[in-house]
From Swiss-Prot:
Top-rank taxon, per record: Bacteria
Protein name (record): Phosphate import ATP-binding protein PstB
An annotated Gene Ontology molecular function: ATP hydrolysis activity
Organism whose genome encodes this protein: Pelagibacter ubique (strain HTCC1062)
Physiological role: Part of the ABC transporter complex PstSACB involved in phosphate import. Responsible for energy coupling to the transport system.
Major localization class: membrane
Amino acid sequence: MKNNKIKIKSSNLNVHYGEKQALFDVDLDIYDKEVTALIGPSGCGKSTFIRCINRMNDVIDICKVEGSITIDDEEIIDKNLDVVGLREKIGMVFQKPNPFPKSIYDNISYGPTIHGLTENKTDMDEIVENSLKKAALWNEVKDRLNEAGTGLSGGQQQRLCIARAISVNPQVILMDEPCSALDPIATAKIEELIDELKKSYTIVIVTHSMSQAVRVSQRTGFFHLGKIIEVDTTEKIFKNPGNKMTQDYITGRFG
């Protein structure tokens, strides 16, 4: 791979939910302005891992996180860290589209407003337009900005959620199975969008679709039972994996 800049680095990351350990000594490097796909069976720790990156696990009382995650060499597993400031750097797109019960415009303007990015209406209009353009949605909704975001189709709602995520100008976008609730046509649009977004953002995508990982990512990490089994270029993982467990998973022998 040409890109050698590590954006996110996880070292000896362990996560417990009460007595249950969800992640075991996870070491994983995520490179800048690339798509890294995380694959593995359900319940193997993929979503837990990405929720550590934006500290969403903080809201779970029984969750205990140990180890290190750095973004641009800054430690984020730190109780004194400004979590709001961290989340300004990290956009999150969930499994099912979850637009706010607000207008299309307000869905996008909400993040920049709470983060204090601008109080100027003209500047906010520009943020909304640019975010929707980056999410390949502007032409479909530019005359409907005052309509409810929940009135859009499923695929449009997910692109609205992507526009909402990038409206605060993040450095990283986390996607937790963003196409699992979408039809093939809507999925193709999201995948085209991911390919375009990686020019500006570091993207981590959790997916159960092997073919999707091949199509959209430059690197792939395989999780199993809370451990990172193998991580390499996507081409190497799918054409010549170095671990038999990886080979068995991608060929459908277990999962």
